[in-house]
From Swiss-Prot:
Subcellular compartments: Nucleus; Cytoplasm
One cellular-component annotation, GO: cytoplasm
InterPro entries the UniProt entry points to: DND1_DSRM, Nucleotide-bd_a/b_plait_sf, RBD_domain_sf, RRM_dom
Keywords: Cytoplasm, Developmental protein, Nucleus, RNA-binding
GO MF annotation list: mRNA 3'-UTR binding; mRNA binding; RNA binding
PANTHER family named in the record: HETEROGENEOUS NUCLEAR RIBONUCLEOPROTEIN
Consequence of substituting Y104C: Inhibits RNA-binding and the relieve of miRNA repression activity
Pfam family membership, one: DND1_DSRM
GO biological process: germ cell development; germ cell migration; heart contraction; mRNA stabilization; negative regulation of miRNA-mediated gene silencing; positive regulation of gene expression; regulation of cell motility
Residue ranges of domain RRM in the record: 60-138
The protein's name in its UniProt record: Dead end protein 1
C-alpha cells in the first residue's frame, strides 16, 4: 500500500512541475493574489481588489485555449493584464492539478476584450506553443427538462434562487404533445453563474425533491457549442496582416531607459535588450469585422496636446520647440532607446456621418508587444494627406499609452 502511494506521488510530481508550482506560489505572495478553486476552475477576481463600478456586461470576455498544462496564472494574468485591467480570470483545472488547456479573461469593456483578441491571438509562449484567443460566447441560459406538469414559473423561480446564484428570470414552456414534460428556460446574470448552476441542479433536485430533471445549455444554432469545454473559432475568416521583417534595435547593446521597466514588468516582458529581442512577437491576426463601440473610439478626441519638448539625458530633439505627434513619438523612442516606431494601417469602415475608421498597429522594437488601436478621420483632399492624418492620430494614442503604463513623459 505504501509502495503504491509512493508511486502515485512520484507520478503526480512528474505530471506537475514543482518549479512552476513554486513560481506560482511566490508570485501570489509577492503580489497579494488570491485564487479560489471552485468546481474544476481556479478563479481570480470577479471583482478584483480595488474594482470600482458595476460588473462588466456581455462582450467583455475572451476565451483562451492551447495553454500548456504547466503554465499557470503567474504567466497568464500579467500577460492579459498588459492589455487592460482584468475583472475576472478563470483557469480550468482537472483533479490532478493540471490545467485543462483553456481559460477565460473578462475585461471592463468590449473594446479592451477586442484589443486582447487582436494582440494576443497566436502569441508565442517561451514554453512553446501559441495561445489561441477568441471572443467568448458567454452562454447564460440553461434548459431544464423533465419538470413535473404541476410546476409553475413563480414556484420554479423561487426554487432555483434557493439552489443557485445569479438567477435572473424563468420562462416556462407548456407541456409537449404527450402532456408529460415541462421545459423551462432559465437566464443567469453571467456565464459563470449559469455554469455553476449546471453542475449542481440535477443532484439538488434529486436530493431535495426526488425529481430527476435534465439540465443543458440552450442551443441557439445547429452546431452544439458548450462553453465549459474548449470551443472552436466562431469568427469569420480572419485577415492576415502582411508580415513585418524583424526590426533592428537602436543601441542594441544598451538597456532601455529605466522608466520603461515598469511597462516591461506589467506585460510580463523581459527587461534587457537581449531578452526583448527574443520576445518580439510575430504579427497577429485581425478580424475584418471586429465591432468597436463608437463611444470608445470617440475617446480619441482627448488626445495629448502638442507640448514643448525638453531634452532628456543630454539628448536634444530635432525641434527645440514643438513636434507633430509622429515626430514626437519618434523622439520619445529615440531618447529612451526603444528603436524607430513602425506603422501598419488598414481601412476598417466608413460611418454614415462621413468619418473613416482605420485600425492601426505600431511596432516599437524595444517593447515586448505591438500597440493596437482604432482612429477616425474625415476624408482628406488626397490619399497622402489622409495617411498622414491616420499616422498622426495613431501616434497620439501610442504616446498616451506609453505615458499611462510607464514613467515616460511626453516632454
Amino acid at each position: 500500500m505504501v509502495g503504491d502511494m509512493d508511486a502515485q506521488q512520484q507520478e503526480l510530481q512528474q505530471i506537475l512541475n514543482p518549479q512552476k508550482l513554486k513560481s506560482l506560489q511566490e508570485w501570489m505572495q509577492r503580489n497579494s493574489i488570491t485564487l479560489t478553486q471552485v468546481n474544476g476552475q481556479r478563479k481570480y477576481g470577479g471583482p478584483p481588489p480595488g474594482w470600482q463600478g458595476p460588473a462588466p456586461g456581455s462582450g467583455c470576455e475572451v476565451f483562451i485555449s492551447q495553454i500548456p498544462n504547466d503554465v499557470y496564472e503567474d504567466r497568464l494574468i500579467p500577460l492579459f493584464q498588459s492589455i487592460g485591467t482584468i475583472y475576472e480570470f478563470r483557469l480550468m483545472m482537472n483533479f490532478s492539478g493540471q490545467t485543462r488547456g483553456f481559460a477565460y479573461a473578462k475585461y471592463g469593456d468590449p473594446l479592451t476584450a477586442s484589443a486582447a483578441v487582436t494582440t494576443l491571438h497566436q502569441y508565442r509562449l517561451p514554453e512553446g506553443g501559441c495561445l489561441t484567443v477568441r471572443r467568448s460566447t458567454e452562454k447564460r441560459q440553461l434548459r431544464l427538462g423533465d419538470l413535473p406538469v404541476s410546476m409553475n414559473e413563480s414556484k420554479l423561480l423561487m426554487v432555483l434562487q434557493m439552489l443557485s446564484d445569479g438567477v435572473e428570470d424563468v420562462l416556462l414552456k407548456p407541456p409537449g404533445p404527450k402532456g408529460k414534460e415541462v421545459v423551462a428556460l432559465v437566464n443567469y446574470t453571467s456565464h459563470y453563474a449559469a455554469s455553476m448552476a449546471k453542475k449542481v441542479l440535477v443532484e439538488a433536485f434529486r436530493n431535495r425533491y426526488g425529481i430527476s430533471i435534465t439540465v443543458r445549455w440552450t442551443s441557439f444554432s445547429k452546431s452544439k457549442r458548450v462553453e465549459d469545454t474548449p470551443q472552436e473559432d466562431s469568427c469569420v475568416t480572419p485577415l492576415v496582416l502582411k508580415p513585418l521583417s524583424k526590426p533592428s534595435l537602436l543601441h542594441y547593446d544598451v538597456p532601455a531607459h529605466q522608466s520603461l521597466l515598469p511597462l516591461f514588468r506589467a506585460v510580463g516582458g523581459p527587461t534587457t535588450s537581449e531578452q526583448r529581442d527574443e520576445m518580439i512577437p510575430q504579427p497577429t491576426i485581425m478580424s475584418r469585422n471586429e465591432l468597436i463601440p463608437q463611444s470608445s473610439i470617440r475617446q480619441r478626441d482627448e488626445m495629448v496636446p502638442q507640448l514643448p519638448i525638453r531634452p532628456r539625458d543630454g539628448m536634444a530633439p530635432q525641434s527645440p520647440i514643438s513636434l507633430d505627434a509622429v515626430s514626437h513619438l519618434q523622439w520619445m523612442c529615440e531618447v529612451n532607446r526603444l528603436g524607430s516606431p513602425q506603422y501598419e494601417v488598414h481601412f476598417h469602415h466608413a460611418a454614415p456621418d462621413g468619418f473613416l475608421y482605420f485600425a492601426f498597429k505600431v511596432l516599437i522594437p524595444g517593447l515586448p508587444l505591438p500597440l493596437y488601436g482604432f482612429v477616425q478621420i474625415l476624408p482628406g483632399t488626397s490619399a497622402r494627406a489622409m495617411k498622414s492624418e491616420v499616422y498622426r492620430a495613431a501616434a497620439e494614442q501610442v504616446i498616451q499609452t506609453l505615458c499611462r503604463v510607464s514613467n515616460l513623459r511626453p516632454f
